[in-house]
Amino acid sequence: MSTRLPAVTVVGSINLDIIATTDRLPTAGETIGGGVLQQQPGGKGANQAVAAARLGGSARMIGAVGDDAQGRQMLEALSGAGVDTADVAVLDGEATGTALIAVDRDGENQIVVCPGANAAFSLEGVEFGPDETVLCQLEVGLPVVLEAARRSPGFFVLNAAPAMDLPAELLERCDLVIVNETEYELIPALTHAKLVAVTYGKGGSAMFEHGRRVAEAPAAAVTAANTIGAGDAFCAALVLALRANLPYPRALAVANAVGADAVGDLSSQPALARLEEYVARVPGAGIAGQ
């Protein structure tokens, strides 16, 4: 593995997560009492940027918050985690994005996202360098993601969540797409993508080149406390591992281990070790079909 981790620029959402933890998730029309309420920083983009920084990478966040107390709280959390927030816009007249989340005793969740400022920012004045790895998600406007793809001269990664139809131009630009198994099924065009990583929860993860499975790694055993943010930690770890020249099976195994630590943490932005510690911890993983 390369000893120097790459610079990762995340273009994505910044949310305040309002989380109600309860024994079970309500059914339609049902009210459940006895919940425990907490608020914490979140948003797929912010979660991925924080994970990249905590793993030892150089992380820059591009996104937006509202000119409100919640926005200031999100900026402080990002900066405190070591993320460069110079390109996070503070938008007058927009509320900071908010996610309303219910979590059950097994760590499963239901989420409603109110995008706020995430739906209103642009890349005006933002520049990307050739050595930057750019990581996007789909919780911000698709035009912003497309513009980032066009303007980024370096390695470009898309976490295609939430799932939606992807323009051919965007898919062709992606050096790597990361999805879970449900998203992989909902976006048929991914079978033609040059490189796709798919997570399967307890089934581990796999890598596909043009629809052909070329590598896989088993999941790490873990007791789930909260699945929010686990996929984001996986994304950050996989990007860093691949850009540090780890082969596909080992990069997947390292990302699985990071995701397992995240699942065991109650926070959407969990405490993580440095990437090299996960590399040392994880045994080799096999090539699919061998």
How should these model regions be labeled?
Residues 2-8, 189-290:
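Conserved phosphate-binding/catalytic region of the ribokinase-like
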Residues 1-64, 71-72, 224, 289-290:
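Glycine-rich phosphate/adenosyl-contacting loop at the front of the ribokinase-like
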Residues 96-99:
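Short alpha-helix plus adjacent loop in nuclease-associated cores
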